[in-house]
Amino acid sequence: VTYSVEVIGVQTGFPFGSYTYGWRLGPHIYDTPPMIGILWLMTLMGAMYWSHKWVGDKDTPKARLAKAAVTATLMVALDIILEPVATQAGFWTWEGDHIPIKNYIAWWVIAFGLALAWRKVHSLRTNRAAGLLFLIQAAFFIGLLLLPWKS
């Protein structure tokens, strides 16, 4: 699902805005590196781990919505950190060299929907390792964001 959304995004500009992938994430299929779908999945699993920790074990409709909202918010927070680094590193390029606000809105909506869907499929679990990986990703991109870049 995540890879399909990225392919649609690259081909149409919807829902994130107009962007193209560089070659640093590996080979492309339909102008999109398959690795990006895996990165989405890893990030989603980590954000879901933390949302479960913070919201709790309740399985009520309200708790499920809260967990999905926290997951989506964590995903967007990571994307806010990741975007400037990824564009500077040549992972992808935005049309007009600016990150459109609709990118962050789309990330939130998609992550919210995926988090809700994920929790309906009980065979798909997230765990502490996913949560740790999320923190490592965040620390990695924060570190890179704070470093000076040569133009």
Segments predicted by a language model, with ranges:
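Aromatic-rich, lipid-facing transmembrane alpha helices and their immediate juxtamembrane interface loops
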Residues: V1-S151
